[in-house]
């Protein structure tokens, strides 16, 4: 009985710590938002530079996409759409494929799965250089990950694992992306291994960063798969 009470007290204390941490993040949200908006405005000022070339605009829009994609998806889509136009004007297949992958990822993130998949199916993988091929497999893996959550069907999570197999053959095995993909891959194959990797990533990642949010989001999927709904809610 004492052991059971101790476990409950520990769980309650852990939940309180998480709640307090979340409350602090919410209280400081306006600071983070202000810093983000200031950084975005500085980048936007570069679009007014005299003599700016189309390629220069493309690269500035790319920075704005990266700033906006986890902050304001509609704005990120706006700059990616513009980059697709630029890539066609410049007749640069690399830019076209890069921007198309970015657009597919954004569509997956906001639930526009049909449009996201149409884009992915239109890309000829045989024509992609190594870096874009890695991006392609990452984007397709993310597509199935988001889709499996939306329909609560583990079958689609297994399809995500199939694309991760291809990704593993290309990606740097010492990178954060590799470890993150590995943890997600094992959700459907070895839950203990998956949990071990997620815990390692959480231990070294700073709370509140975009990477931390990605880890907790994916870890919550593992909890859901294991039917540990209280732990899923916590993350």
Predicted ranges, named:
Residues 7-235:
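A "functional boundary" signal
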């Amino acid at each position: 009985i004492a052991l059971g009470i101790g476990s409950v007290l520990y769980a309650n204390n852990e939940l309180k710590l998480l709640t307090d941490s979340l409350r602090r993040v919410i209280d400081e949200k306006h600071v983070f938002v202000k810093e983000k908006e200031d950084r975005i405005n500085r980048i936007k000022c570069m679009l007014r530079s005299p003599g700016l070339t189309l390629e220069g605009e493309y690269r500035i829009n790319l920075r704005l996409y990266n700033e906006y994609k986890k902050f304001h998806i509609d704005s990120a889509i706006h700059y990616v759409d513009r980059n697709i136009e630029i890539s066609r004007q410049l007749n640069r297949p690399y830019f076209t494929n890069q921007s198309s992958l970015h657009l597919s990822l954004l569509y997956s993130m906001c639930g526009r799965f049909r449009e996201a998949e149409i884009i992915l199916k239109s890309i000829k993988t045989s024509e992609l250089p190594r870096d874009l091929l890695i991006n392609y497999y990452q984007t397709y893996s993310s597509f199935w990950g988001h889709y499996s959550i939306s329909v609560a069907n583990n079958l689609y999570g297994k399809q995500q694992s199939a694309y991760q197999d291809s990704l593993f053959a290309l990606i740097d095995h010492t990178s954060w992306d590799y470890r993150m993909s590995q943890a997600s891959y094992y959700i459907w194959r070895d839950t203990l291994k998956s949990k071990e990797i997620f815990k390692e990533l959480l231990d070294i990642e700073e709370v509140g960063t975009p990477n931390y949010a990605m880890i907790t989001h994916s870890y919550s999927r593992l909890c859901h798969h294991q039917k540990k709904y209280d732990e899923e809610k916590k993350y």
